[in-house]
Amino acid sequence: MSYQQQQCKQPCQPPPVCPPKKCPEPCPPPQCPEPCPPPKCPEPCPESCPPPSYQQKCPPVQPPPPCQQKCPPKSK
């Protein structure tokens, strides 16, 4: 058998991993704690706020005062 033929042989595949034959035991049912107490009712909602009163009017926007500064005469 030449060296090349030896190289060409595929190595054996490992046997597949068989699952264990014994069935796993089912989990025991969870131990229920004491039943939950009934949910506490929240306090009743406070009365809603009255709508804001729109009687106060905003002061009118004042335009900026006109510029009082005078430019110095240009010197020639």
Swiss-Prot record:
GO terms for biological process: epidermis development; keratinization; keratinocyte differentiation. Residues 21-47 are annotated as: 3 X 9 AA approximate tandem repeats. Residues 40-76 are annotated as: Disordered. Residues 40-53 have a biased composition (Pro residues). Keywords: Cytoplasm, Keratinization, Repeat. One of its GO terms (cellular component) is cytoplasm. It is found in: Cytoplasm. Transmembrane segments: none annotated. It comes from the Eukaryota. Not expressed in uterus. Sequence repeats lie at residues 21-29, 30-38, 39-47. Pfam families: SPRR2. Cross-linked envelope protein of keratinocytes. It is a keratinocyte protein that first appears in the cell cytosol, but ultimately becomes cross-linked to membrane proteins by transglutaminase. All that results in the formation of an insoluble envelope beneath the plasma membrane. This is Small proline-rich protein 2I. The lineage of its organism: Eukaryota, Metazoa, Chordata, Craniata, Vertebrata. The gene is Sprr2i.
